[in-house]
Amino acid sequence: YANATPFYGAVVACVDEPMVKRILPDISRPVITYGFSGDAEFQADCREYREIRSTFLAKNRKKELGEINLNVPGAHNIKNALAAISLSIEMNIDFEIIQKGLKKYSGVKRRFEIKGIYDDVLIIDDYAHHPTEVSATLRAIKNGWRRRLVTIFQPHLFSRTKHFYEDFARSFLISDVLIITDVFP
């Protein structure tokens, strides 16, 4: 798949993912790497999570580019921002424009969507339907708020639930309380 990239293109890859790192030597196209790992070309340093915001210092080959302020929480969103930064820099977009654009981004519907606060309880709706997404979302909550986390989960599809039930179980260990509803068929 990566080798199908046109000769004028590049593959943007997160080196924090072991499977991605393993296939890098097999990619014949130019590769741009990002992640928290020290061997990534684009890195995030001095990461801070405060409620719905994430802040980090963006670096390119260890050289500081500047601070990025995101209006979405979590390490996974910082990695998404690093991917966008690396691609934007590759396309010669000015870093200040990248900063402004990322600061304006506030997420998409049903992904960490704050529904309201009721009796000092923050209600968040998130359509995480894979264990990796569930873990990332719950970790973002734990890192940003440092409060008790009650999770209500509605599994989608019997086949997915059966296939990933052990991974789902591990992902929910982050929660203080877990409520599981009926499977949505």
Regions from the language model: what does each represent?
Residues Y1-I123, R146-R147:
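Acidic, Mg2+-coordinating active-site environments of NTP-dependent enzymes
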Residues N77-N80, I97, E133, T137, ...:
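Generic hydrophobic secondary-structure packing signal
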Residues K63, A75, N92, H129, ...:
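Short, glycine-/Ser/Thr-/acidic-enriched flexible segments
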Residues K21, L87, T132-E133, T161:
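Active-site-proximal flexible loops/turns
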